[in-house]
């Protein structure tokens, strides 16, 4: 029986998809890359912002066409959109057989079997459950790097965010389970572990009574075969001395942190429900750069939040200019139903949001270009991602670059390299957000 799987949304959702793929593969289902060859389709959806919701809905409708035409035996929808709009999906898209919530993905085999039997089901476990199936994940990221989801859910309840409603409260995965999963990934050839959660920095607080990310990192560093460990989704107010110290001590931990700050105006941060201030952000970033001089900092910002004035936008611009983040992404504010921010007064016009987004990205581009110029002549360690077609060159990443969201380095060489290899490269040039180098 052939299954075509679509995974939408974030890297945390991708981990759920890989767990489901592992369960289906272990049960004997054949995973196919061609949707026209599928007997069953599974769509793992996202609904974090409006565009993600639209993409999920359109994907379901596109795949439902195969069911309507009789070319597909079963269609299963899971993930955040399924959790949030479970009954609407079943009622309005009759081609969908089974809807699985965000904490029911461990029931994917049963869901597929029910769908093949012609049943129409909505399967929702307790939103605060923490499914931990024993079956190994089917890694889809190429085999040389993988995401390790260390927790589920979120307790922050930012005013613009729907995540607690679709993912539940914060639940840390027990450390021994994560060590086991990391070892299994390494046994499959993974060399870079990327730790993810809605928030990684409070890992362990709920089950161990204290923040334990630094302890988890120490344990992961003991696993042979792991070369890099990277941290994403680190809330700046939760960065502490224990985390900084372990980053300084353990050579496997990339000197890279993803710090989603969202804004730099105290008034907007308060309206967002963020638990920090502009000065606290400055203090944290300053301390990180002092303690770990070669650290690369990534952040994300939201522009056009309700009530954001031109002066507050300019305050963000000044902050970005002063902090000189190595990596930065900007989202325009997306009002999500059932969130406090969606009903706040003074909603901003889309054109204004987009203009402000462009302002920030233009400034950031100048910062990144200057930083890239400073890299010329330096030697860097590169993880090879693949070969450039029809050229004596490869593409890879430095410790400063997370996959899919950051830049790349193009490596010129006549030597043969393999995906996942580590190579020493001398930077010889820069091209927008990417670097160019030669194998040493």
Segments the model singles out, each with a brief description of its role:
Residues 93-94, 115-118, 211-213, 247-248, ...:
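Short, hinge-like loop/turn segments at secondary-structure boundaries
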Residues 191, 227, 326, 331, ...:
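Short acidic/polar active-site loop segments enriched in Thr and Asp
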Residues 178, 195, 231, 259, ...:
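Conserved, mostly hydrophobic/aromatic
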Residues 343-440:
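Terminal RNA-binding accessory module
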